[in-house]
């Protein structure tokens, strides 16, 4: 495994713990593509015997699962339980949920809440439209911030100097793949106060993103996704109006005072 640096606060990283986390993240990223022992050992650059021992430990504790032959590995059910506990314990998510319901009721479109995680956005809550099939996101999914309304709304809250160097991954022909193109788009986001994703993350889907400025810089955002086929100029203006109102309601809602922790 490559050498690891120091953790935050000057505390030296525990290699065994880091290896375990890297393995779980690798399996989670593979989704429905199970991995073989040698694949995992090669990916993390650790001896096959060490990887086997780690896998067996995690299988016994429910963090990793294996098939009936014992040769394929995937993420286990305890990862789901931990993720659910994260959502249930987060005061921001709990506070935002009723307003997502209101926006969904008013618009009949898909509404999301997401949080910036490095260069990605993690989806924390979704209200699906009853008018069309599922779009690109579900709770727990991560997408690169540069290719969606949620991510661009949050990137616009930060200086362009923090943007990573390109080229960026493209999901569609409309995705920004250069730092310069993304920065130009973010300048427009700052001017208008919300982001627009016109088929940059998924063909046929337009998104409108609104950063929630209860933190500085904003860590969370909400968005509305709508099929191009349903989007008229009048419909677009209605979506923007409702989502602006929703953002204002969320930002002016008093924070929880029942001993909730303010996480960083």
List the model feature ranges, each with a label.
Residues 78-106, 134-135:
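Conserved segment of winged-helix/HTH DNA-binding domains
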Residues 106-111, 191-194:
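Short N-terminal helix-loop-first-beta-strand/juxtamembrane motif that initiates sensory/input modules
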Residues 131-203:
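Short, solvent-exposed recognition segments
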Residues 113-118, 126-127:
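Short hydrophobic alpha-helical segments used for membrane anchoring or interfacial signaling
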Residues 2-89, 248-253:
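N-terminal helix-turn-helix
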Residues 175-247:
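Extended hydrophobic
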Residues 256-264:
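Short, highly charged C-terminal tails/helix-capping segments
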Residues 28, 151, 155, 159, ...:
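Short amphipathic alpha-helical signal-transduction/dimerization elements
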């Amino acid at each position: 495994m490559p050498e690891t640096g120091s953790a935050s606060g000057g505390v030296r990283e525990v290699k065994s713990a880091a290896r375990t986390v890297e393995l779980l993240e690798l399996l989670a990223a593979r989704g429905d593509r199970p991995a073989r022992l040698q694949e995992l050992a090669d990916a993390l650059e650790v001896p096959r015997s060490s990887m086997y021992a780690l896998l067996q430990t995690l299988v016994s504790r429910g963090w990793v699962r294996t098939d009936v032959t014992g040769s394929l590995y995937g993420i286990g059910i305890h990862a789901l339980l931990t993720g659910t506990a994260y959502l249930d314990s987060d005061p921001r998510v709990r506070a935002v949920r009723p307003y997502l319901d209101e926006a969904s009721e008013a618009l009949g479109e898909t509404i999301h809440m997401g949080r910036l995680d490095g260069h990605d956005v993690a989806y924390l809550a979704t209200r699906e439209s009853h008018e069309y099939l599922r779009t690109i996101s579900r709770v727990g999914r991560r997408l690169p911030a540069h290719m969606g309304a949620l991510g661009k709304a949050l990137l616009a809250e930060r200086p362009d100097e923090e943007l990573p160097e390109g080229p960026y991954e493209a999901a569609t022909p409309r995705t920004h793949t250069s730092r310069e193109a993304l920065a130009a788009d973010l300048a427009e986001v700052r001017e208008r106060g919300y982001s627009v994703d016109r088929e940059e993350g998924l063909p046929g889907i337009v998104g409108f993103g609104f950063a929630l400025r209860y933190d500085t810089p904003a860590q969370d955002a909400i968005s509305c996704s709508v099929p191009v086929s349903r989007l008229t100029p009048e419909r677009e203006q209605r979506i923007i109006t409702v989502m602006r109102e929703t953002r204002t309601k969320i930002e002016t809602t008093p924070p929880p005072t029942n001993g909730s922790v303010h996480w960083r």
